[in-house]
Design a protein with these regions (language model features):
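Amphipathic, interaction-prone secondary-structure segments
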Residues: 38-84
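Acidic, proline/glycine-rich low-complexity IDRs
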Residues: 1-45, 76-138
Length: 138
């Protein structure tokens, strides 16, 4: 049986507007990710974090992308469904209010966005832990 690998990378914007590439990590553990969050001061920055499962499974979670801007986080998990379709899971998938918030120039229901960095770290931890086990987000 092949084992899967989680690849982590991304970028953030420095205060001077420069794009800072995050070094790619293979199979990061949650301590590395938490340490990265603690030293990066993300609540004042904008950027994108990507966790990708390689090789891509036939079905299940394949990628977690976390968009962040000014202390707000938008996690999105891409999932290959058993019928081969692609789905995206967010923090909340039904009963939206009409309120939206702009993240990286696009508007999203506020229910998809969180200021709670601990919740985002838990989502990342769960994604890394389960790798390709299909499961709903918290």
């Amino acid at each position: 049986m092949k084992t899967s690998t989680v690849i982590f990378g991304g970028f953030f914007m420095a205060d001077n507007g420069e794009r800072i590439q995050i070094p790619v990590l293979e199979n990061p553990d949650i301590r590395e990710i938490n340490r990265f969050f603690s030293v990066s001061n993300f609540e004042k920055k904008a950027g994108v974090l990507v966790f990708r499962i390689i090789p891509e499974p036939k079905f299940g979670h394949t990628e977690l992308t976390v968009y962040f801007e000014k202390g707000y986080y938008l996690p999105m998990i891409q999932t290959i469904l058993e019928d081969g379709d692609i789905g995206v899971e967010n923090l909340k998938t039904e009963n939206y209010s009409v309120k939206t918030m702009e993240i990286w120039g696009d508007f999203y229901p506020i229910e998809h966005i969180s200021k709670n960095i601990s919740a985002i770290q838990n989502i990342i931890s769960e994604f890394i832990r389960q790798k390709q086990t299909p499961a709903p987000m918290v």
